[in-house]
Amino acid sequence: MKPQQPQPPLLLLLLLPLLLTTVSSYPLNPKQLKALQSLNISTPTNDPCNNNNNQSSSSSITCDDASPYRHITSISFTNCSSTLSLPSKTLKPLSKSLISLSFTNCPSLSPPYHLPISLHSFSAVSSFLQNNRTKLSGLFLARLKNLKTLYISSTPIQTSRRLYVILGNMHKLTSLTISNSNLTGLIPKSFHSNLRYIDLSNNSLKGSIRISITRLKNLKSLNLSHNSLSGQIPNKIKSLTFLKNLSLASNKLSGTIPNSLSSISELTHLDLSMNQLNGTVPSFFSEMKNLKHLNLADNSFHGVLPFNESFIKNLNFFEIGRNSELCYNKTVLSSNLKLEGLAPCDKYGFPLWSPSQKEESLSGENDYDVEGGNEEKTENLKTKEEEEEEHKGSNKTLFGLGIGLFSLVFLILFLFYLAKRCRLI
């Protein structure tokens, strides 16, 4: 009997690894290889496209699978040498294929001003820091009109132009991060509708939260924290129905939390801490089933905290402290919860502790730990009004005693006088 011949599909499967090896063995474009060699980029083999797993390398390179030559599509520089430079003659051979370029911890490097405008992704973290000549230019960024991702962090942007001028031509941009980059001015009056992620935190932006942001129907994350934004949270924020993360912390926002915020049912992370927000804490938060992170600390909220124990326990993070006029109902919330910087309410719904008493009574303890001996201390604490009433009462008592003693002395003297007159008669 003749041995059975392998079926064609099985034969193809057996040959597939060989075919893949053949494809990946195509050499790098000679001009691009020469450009890399001029940058002194060390590679473990003759193929720079295979250095991604080399931890000792200061660069990471990605290539396509084109034939007869492969092309570089992505370069990431990390911990750059002070001697590294990117002259235009080096970048020019890369311009036709390079779509992603990133720099991390390259402080002495000058920005690559001759970058190809075909880039889809540009990232700079703690780079271009040495002097004004090497700082990143807003005008340079504005040229990159094909970007889909722009990530700038801890890298100053030198520009007298407004943020909109930088972003104006980036119609394809979906992810925008410019954080800790010395941005000033106002939030742009308009954004391109493709944006899904915005992080403009740790800058010096001022003015109000513009309505332009609420028109970004596909926005999933918005971080405007650590700026100098003022005014109120706009009611139209309810339009951001796909928003999952919202951070407006460390600004100068005032007014109340708008009820329209309850319309963002997908919200999982909300940080409004360190502002000047006032009014009562909305009860609708407890109905937002996806909410896992809630920070309302360091504001001017007042009244009774409207949350129950099950809602707070369902959160991964909850901070509400340092709202001096806000308190919790200890008959609703268990003492097992740890609420830092929040006083219990008295029977009238006001904080039981004054701020000075809070500091004394909370030294080394949690604000919510009021069981046992702590509960007895809590009951013995008096508000300023109670102390004033006691002080007034003691003054009245002393005054009454004084009048009584004076009357007694007068009566004795009067009787003595009458007795003396009777003897004379």
Swiss-Prot record:
LRR repeats lie at residues 144-169, 170-193, 195-216, 217-240, 242-264, 265-287, 288-313. The keyword Plastid does not apply. Glycans are attached at N40, N54, N79, N132, N182, N202, N223, N245, N278, N308, N329, N395. GO terms for cellular component: plasma membrane. The keyword Glycoprotein applies. One of its GO terms (biological process) is defense response. Coiled coil: none annotated. It comes from the Eukaryota. It is a single-pass type I membrane protein. The chain crosses the membrane at residues 398-418. Residues 26-397 are extracellular. Residues 374-389 have a biased composition (Basic and acidic residues). PANTHER family: OS01G0750400 PROTEIN, RECEPTOR-LIKE PROTEIN 51-RELATED. This is Receptor-like protein 55.
